[in-house]
C-alpha cells in the first residue's frame, strides 16, 4: 500500500479496529494526514520501573502511524513523573524521589525503543524527555509564560479531576492540579522543536491533550490535534491487563514471557477477535477470516494461540516466544527434557506456584507444604492412587524421599497432582 494512501485512510483504519475513542476536529486531521507525513507524540510517565499492558495500545498506535510514513516521538516524562497525573485517580499519588524516577525513565526509554524504528530516514522515531525543558525552568517563567494561558474556571470543570474536587476527604494538591499545565506545555514544546501536530494517548488523557492543543494555539498560533485510544475493557466487566498476581508487565523480569503468553491464551472467546484488532498488525480481513474459521471448525478456537503468539513475539521477540511455547508444551505433555535452566527460572518467577525446601524432605511433606494436599494422611492416599508425578514421572510410593536425580539443574523439581495442579520445588 502506498504511504500517502495509507495516511489519508489511517483514521478510518484505526476506527475500523476500534482504536479511536475521541478525536479533535477529525475532518481537519484527515485532511492534514492526506497532505503528507506528520510528526506525532505519545507520552509515557515513569510511574513504575516498567510499562504494563495498558501502555501497549498507545505504543502500538505510534508504530501504526510510523508504518504509514509518519514520524513518532516517544516522550518519557522525566518531569511529569515527578509530579503525578491526577486524571481519574481517586487519591493523591505518592511522590517518588528524583533518583528513582530517573532510573525508571531509563528503563522505560529502553522498553519503548524496540517498538519503533529510530533509523529509517525521514520518519525515524525520536526519543524525548520533558525534564529537558522543565528541569531548569524557574517558577516565574512557569507562572507568566504558561500559567497565564490557563483558566482555573475551565480546569476545575475537567472530568478527570472533578471527582477529586467534589470530595472533602481527599481533595487534590496544587502539585497534581498543575500537572495539566505541564502536559499542555509538552505539546507546545514538541510542536516548536519537532513540528509535532498530533498527540495520542489513553482516553483518560483527553483533558490533558485538549489543554495542550489550546496552549499550542495560544503560544505558536498552530493548529494541532488529539486522538485518544479507548480504555480496554473485557466482556465480563473485569479489569483488563490484571491477573490475580497484579498487573501484566512488559518487563520479562516482572512478568515472565511464559506468564505473558499464558495471559493471552486465557483470553475469553468474546474478547479475542477484538483484541487481535487492538494488539496485532493482522489485517481486518485476516482477523475476520480467522473468526469465521474458528466458528466453523467444530474445534477449540485457534484465535487465542494466534493472539498469544503475535503479542508475545512483539514484546519478547522470537526467543521469548520460543521459551513460552516450549514451557507450555512441556507442562502439557509432562516431558521436561526440552526445558533449559532459564525456562525453570521463568517458572519459578511466576509461572506456577513455587516453594523452597531444604534437602532431605520427603514427597508427602512437599505435597503438604506446596498445598497440593491438605495433610500427610491425604497425601499418602493420593500418592498411592497414582495421581502424583515428579518431573513428569508417576510416583506411587508414599514413603518416597527425593534423590539428587530429581533435582533438575541441581535445583528444581516439578510436582503435579492430577492433570493441572503444579508446584515447583526450589531446593535450598
UniProtKB/Swiss-Prot annotation:
It is an enzyme of class 6 (ligase). A motif ('HIGH' region) lies at residues 46-55. CDD domains: S4 (cd00165), TyrRS_core (cd00805). L-tyrosine binds at residues 41, 179, 183. It is found in: Cytoplasm. It catalyses: tRNA(Tyr) + L-tyrosine + ATP = L-tyrosyl-tRNA(Tyr) + AMP + diphosphate + H(+). A motif ('KMSKS' region) lies at residues 239-243. Gene3D superfamilies: HUPs, RNA-binding S4 domain, Tyrosyl-Transfer RNA Synthetase. GO terms for molecular function: ATP binding; RNA binding; tyrosine-tRNA ligase activity. Its main location: cytoplasm. Its EC number is 6.1.1.1. Keywords: Aminoacyl-tRNA synthetase, ATP-binding, Cytoplasm, Ligase, Nucleotide-binding, Protein biosynthesis, RNA-binding. GO terms for cellular component: cytosol. The keyword Hydrolase does not apply. InterPro entries: aa-tRNA-synth_I_CS, aa-tRNA-synth_Ic, Rossmann-like_a/b/a_fold, S4_RNA-bd, S4_RNA-bd_sf, SYY-like_C, Tyr-tRNA-ligase, Tyr-tRNA-ligase_bac-type. The keyword RNA-binding applies. GO terms for biological process: tyrosyl-tRNA aminoacylation. ATP binds at residue 242. Homodimer. Catalyzes the attachment of tyrosine to tRNA(Tyr) in a two-step reaction: tyrosine is first activated by ATP to form Tyr-AMP and then transferred to the acceptor end of tRNA(Tyr). Belongs to the class-I aminoacyl-tRNA synthetase family. TyrS type 1 subfamily. This is Tyrosine--tRNA ligase. The lineage of its organism: Bacteria, Pseudomonadati, Pseudomonadota, Gammaproteobacteria, Enterobacterales. The gene is tyrS.
Amino acid at each position: 500500500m502506498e504511504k500517502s494512501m495509507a495516511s489519508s485512510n489511517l483514521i478510518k483504519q484505526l476506527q475500523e479496529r476500534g482504536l479511536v475513542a475521541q478525536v479533535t476536529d477529525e475532518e481537519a486531521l484527515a485532511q492534514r494526514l492526506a497532505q503528507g507525513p506528520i510528526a506525532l507524540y505519545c507520552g509515557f510517565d515513569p510511574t513504575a520501573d516498567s510499562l504494563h499492558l495498558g501502555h501497549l495500545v498507545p505504543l502500538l498506535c505510534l508504530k501504526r502511524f510510523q508504518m504509514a510514513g509518519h514520524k513518532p516521538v516517544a516522550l518519557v516524562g522525566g518531569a511529569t513523573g515527578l509530579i503525578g497525573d491526577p486524571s481519574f485517580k481517586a487519591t493523591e499519588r505518592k511522590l517518588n524521589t528524583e533518583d528513582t524516577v530517573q532510573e525508571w525513565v531509563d528503563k522505560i526509554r529502553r522498553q519503548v525503543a524496540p517498538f519503533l524504528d529510530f533509523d529509517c530516514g525521514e520518519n525515524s522515531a525520536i526519543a524525548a524527555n520533558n525534564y529537558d525543558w522543565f528541569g531548569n525552568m524557574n517558577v516565574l517563567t512557569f507562572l507568566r509564560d504558561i500559567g497565564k494561558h490557563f483558566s482555573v474556571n475551565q480546569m476545575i470543570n475537567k472530568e478527570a479531576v472533578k471527582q477529586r474536587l467534589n470530595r472533602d476527604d481527599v481533595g487534590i494538591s496544587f502539585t497534581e492540579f498543575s500537572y495539566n499545565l505541564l502536559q499542555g506545555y509538552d505539546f507546545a514544546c514538541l510542536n516548536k522543536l519537532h513540528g509535532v501536530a498530533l498527540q495520542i494517548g489513553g482516553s483518560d488523557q483527553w483533558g490533558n491533550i485538549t489543554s495542550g492543543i489550546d496552549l499550542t494555539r495560544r503560544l505558536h498560533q498552530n493548529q494541532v490535534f488529539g486522538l485518544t485510544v479507548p480504555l480496554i475493557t473485557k466482556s465480563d466487566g473485569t479489569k483488563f491487563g490484571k491477573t490475580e498476581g497484579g498487573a501484566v508487565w512488559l518487563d520479562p523480569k516482572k512478568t515472565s514471557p511464559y506468564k505473558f503468553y499464558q495471559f493471552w491464551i486465557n483470553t475469553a472467546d468474546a474478547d479475542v477477535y477484538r483484541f487481535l484488532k487492538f494488539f496485532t498488525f493482522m489485517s481486518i480481513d485476516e482477523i475476520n477470516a480467522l473468526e469465521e474459521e474458528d466458528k466453523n471448525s467444530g474445534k477449540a478456537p485457534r484465535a487465542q494461540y494466534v493472539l498469544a503468539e503475535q503479542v508475545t513475539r512483539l514484546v519478547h521477540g522470537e526467543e521469548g516466544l520460543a521459551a513460552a511455547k516450549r514451557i507450555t508444551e512441556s507442562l502439557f505433555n509432562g516431558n521436561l527434557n526440552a526445558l533449559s535452566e532459564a525456562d525453570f527460572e521463568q517458572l519459578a518467577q511466576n509461572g506456577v506456584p513455587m516453594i523452597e525446601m531444604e534437602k532431605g524432605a520427603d514427597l508427602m511433606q512437599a505435597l503438604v507444604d506446596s498445598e497440593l494436599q491438605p495433610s500427610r494422611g491425604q497425601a499418602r492416599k493420593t500418592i498411592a492412587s497414582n495421581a502424583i508425578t515428579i518431573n513428569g514421572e508417576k510416583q506411587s510410593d508414599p514413603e518416597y524421599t527425593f534423590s539428587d536425580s530429581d533435582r533438575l539443574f541441581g535445583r528444581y523439581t516439578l510436582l503435579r497432582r492430577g492433570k493441572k495442579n503444579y508446584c515447583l520445588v526450589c531446593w535450598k
